[in-house]
Amino acid sequence: MSVEDWRRKIYEIDRKLVELLNERSKCVVEIGQLKKTDGSPLYQPDREREVLAGVERANRGPLSAAAIRRLFERILDEARSVERTVMHDEAKKAGE
């Protein structure tokens, strides 16, 4: 395959990653609504450690465990941001 062929393949993979990240975020929205309803805290460090350990175990390379951890730390950070927005919006709606 040529460089352009590989780039097209990467482009398609990137599109799939975006789809999956948005699908994951939809789940996060639902979790945020449930946490708001039952009064659960936004930040749950034990759960985040569990997620990070799971993705590190699932990694078969060529990315290093450290690289996977950094990527998922960022994903989890964005997930908290989404949850925070959902929980805040739900609280705002309840106060109206």
Which residues are covered by each model-predicted region?
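Domain-level signature for soluble enzymes in the chorismate/prephenate branch of the shikimate pathway
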Residues: 1-96
